[in-house]
A protein has these predicted regions:
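A short beta-strand motif characteristic of beta-propeller blades
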Residues: 1-7, 51-57, 97-108, 149-155
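Beta-rich, blade/repeat-based domains predominating
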Residues: 8-24, 36, 57-73, 105-125, ...
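Residue position within the beta-strands of beta-propeller blades
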Residues: 25-27, 77, 128
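Short loop/turn segments immediately following the C-termini of beta-strands
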Residues: 29-31, 44, 80, 90, ...
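Structural motif
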Residues: 34-40, 84-87, 135-138
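Short loop/turn segments immediately following beta-strands, especially the blade-tip
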Residues: 41-49, 87-97, 139-147
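C-terminal hydrophobic structural anchor segments
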Residues: 86, 94-133, 138
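Blade-level signature of beta-propeller repeat domains, shared across WD40, Kelch, NHL, RCC1
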Residues: 131-167
Length: 167
């Protein structure tokens, strides 16, 4: 098909993922500007791309990777600059709503610099690769409300580790 050029609602679109209804969810990094992070959602159709919601500000820094639970109810972005993860509800129409007013749904620790994330097939666990301290933070996902409960941190990864997959 013909490529479509669509300006982003937020500045510096970085991570992206499609939910089960075909909505495009995008992290807006704002050039890594302090406490400017956000996410936006878009409707994608043969006629083009249109904004559903956003930018929905999370007051965190440098949102990076985006993951969505299998049921399509929750989405998360890793905030590299502030060492945490922000969670959002995805409403049926694709509208995003931030879980926590402060945007901190799960902390990966000071200096952790979370980058890549993955959710296992049952959407029970979220794994976050932390580039600042070469660890993986593991969280249990609350399947009713989307909250994140820290389970463990795995250390000893090689410096420069990138990419993450979960089953």
């Amino acid at each position: 098909g013909t490529p479509i050029n669509q300006p982003s609602a937020g500045d510096t679109p970085f991570g992206f993922e499609f939910d089960k209804r075909g909505h495009l969810i995008v992290s807006d990094a704002y050039g890594g500007g302090e406490l400017l992070g956000a996410m936006s959602s878009y409707n994608v159709s043969p006629g083009g791309i249109s904004l559903i919601s956003g930018p929905v500000v999370n007051t965190q820094t440098a949102p990076c990777w985006v993951v969505i639970t299998k049921n399509g109810k929750f989405t998360y972005t890793s905030n590299t600059g502030t060492g945490n993860i922000s969670g959002y509800w995805i409403k049926h129409d694709g509208t995003l709503e931030l879980f926590n007013d402060d945007g901190n749904t799960g902390s990966t620790g000071e200096g952790s610099k979370p980058i890549d994330m993955a959710i296992n097939n049952s959407s029970q666990y979220l794994y976050c690769l932390n580039g600042g301290n070469q660890t993986i933070s593991v969280f249990r996902i609350d399947n009713r409300h989307g909250g994140l409960k820290p389970i463990q941190t795995v250390s000893g990864l090689p410096v420069g580790s990138v990419g993450l997959a979960a089953n």
